[in-house]
Each structure stands twice: as structure tokens, then as C-alpha cells.
Curated annotation (Swiss-Prot):
GO process terms (BP): defense response; ethylene-activated signaling pathway; positive regulation of DNA-templated transcription; regulation of defense response; regulation of ethylene-activated signaling pathway
UniProt xrefs under SUPFAM superfamilies: DNA-binding domain
Protein name: Ethylene-response factor C3
Protein family membership: Belongs to the AP2/ERF transcription factor family. ERF subfamily.
Any GO MF annotation of the entry: sequence-specific DNA binding
DNA-binding stretch(es), residue numbering of this chain: 65-123
Keywords: Activator, DNA-binding, Ethylene signaling pathway, Nucleus, Plant defense, Transcription, Transcription regulation
KW Transcription (keyword) present: yes
InterPro entries referenced in this protein's UniProt entry, alphabetically: AP2/ERF_dom, AP2/ERF_dom_sf, DNA-bd_dom_sf, ERF_plant
Organism of provenance: Solanum lycopersicum
Domain of life from the UniProt record: Eukaryota
Length: 193
């Protein structure tokens, strides 16, 4: 039963299981009446999507999804690709601070593997330029994906070595030669026990 207005509902109230003297029933009745009047307004309007709904949906979506990129629970982004030269094995390319870096790593691997047939996140010119900056030369013996993975892991290792070297350096205050002699003598006497 489709009623176009609240008056129509009042006219047919006997057909609905509402008690006019009960406040809860009347509250429910008013909600049904408002809903039916809104349905008629919506059905008479066009079937297009409201612009408000579209913009609010896009505002909720914060991160852009990139091909070959997954967000880790701790906030980093992992890039990986299926390597067709190795029977479709999934190859982890690296973990990156932001999604764009991870997407570029995926694009580099995809372009190196598939060439112009690759489906990329970024324009081909950007990917080619980034590969040229890395001075990538792929030989026929090795998978280009593995080669890129090695480059990313070497870069990561060199950064971690630099950080480790900075952490391993301990600077002592010069307390004089006499104090150093006392420390050496006391350490020798402890080891002789």
C-alpha cells in the first residue's frame, strides 16, 4: 500500500495496527507517515545520485589505492609484484614510508618486466625517468624484479648501516691517564679472581 500523504494514512489508519490512544504507537505512526511522504518526493525526483552523496564518499576515502601497494598496520606501505619470469611468484619489493614511493617501486618493476604492456600507477614518463635516475641496467640472465628488489634492499641496508654506525659511537670524557690506569688495574684484578 503506497500512500502519498499523511492524510491518506489517517484515512486508512484502521488498516494499520496502531492504537490512537497509545503514545508509542502514535510516535511510530508519525515516523511511518514521514517516511512515506519522503518516499513519494524521492520517487518523483530523478533517479540520479545526489552530488552531496558523491562528495561525502570521496571525503571519507583518505588514502588512494595503488596497484601493487598494501598498507601495513603500523602505517608503512609495502610494494610487491608477481614475477612472470619466475612462474608468477609474488616478490616483495620493499617497505616504504608513503604510498607514492611504494607505487613507484611497483611501477618500476612492472615497466621493467612488461614494458609498454604494463599497467602503471603513474605516467610512463615518470617511471622511465625514475629508472634512468637509478641507472638500471637489466641483463637477460636475471629477472628485472629481482634486480630492483636488490637495489631497494641495498639502499635500505646502507641507510641502516649509517644509522647503526651513528648509534655505535660512544664519546667518553677525557678523565686523564691516571684514572685510565686505575680502571685497567681494577679490571685486571677482577678477572684474576
Amino acid at each position: 500500500m503506497d500512500y502519498s500523504s499523511r492524510d491518506d494514512l489517517l484515512f486508512h489508519y484502521n488498516s494499520l495496527p496502531f492504537n490512537v490512544n497509545d503514545t508509542q504507537d502514535m510516535l511510530l505512526y508519525n515516523l511511518v507517515a514521514e517516511g512515506s511522504s519522503q518516499e513519494t518526493v524521492n520517487s518523483s525526483s530523478s533517479y540520479g545520485i545526489k552530488e552531496e552523496e558523491v562528495t561525502s564518499y570521496e571525503e571519507e576515502r583518505k588514502d588512494k589505492n595503488y596497484r601493487g601497494v598494501r598498507k601495513r598496520p603500523w602505517g608503512k606501505y609495502a610494494a610487491e609484484i608477481r614475477d612472470s619470469t619466475r612462474n608468477g611468484v609474488r616478490v616483495w619489493l620493499g617497505t616504504f614510508d608513503n604510498a607514492e614511493e611504494a607505487a613507484l617501486a611497483y611501477d618500476q618493476a612492472a615497466f621493467a618486466m612488461r614494458g609498454s604492456m604494463a599497467i602503471l600507477n603513474f605516467p610512463v614518463e615518470i617511471v622511465k625517468e625514475s629508472l634512468n635516475e637509478m641507472k638500471c641496467r637489466f641483463d637477460g640472465n636475471c629477472s628485472p624484479v629481482i634486480e630492483l628488489k636488490k637495489r631497494y634492499s641495498m639502499r635500505r641496508k646502507s641507510v641502516s648501516r649509517k644509522n647503526r654506525a651513528r648509534k655505535d659511537v660512544v664519546v667518553f670524557e677525557d678523565l686523564g691517564a691516571e684514572y685510565l690506569e686505575e680502571l685497567l688495574i681494577s679490571s685486571e684484578s677482577i678477572t684474576n679472581w
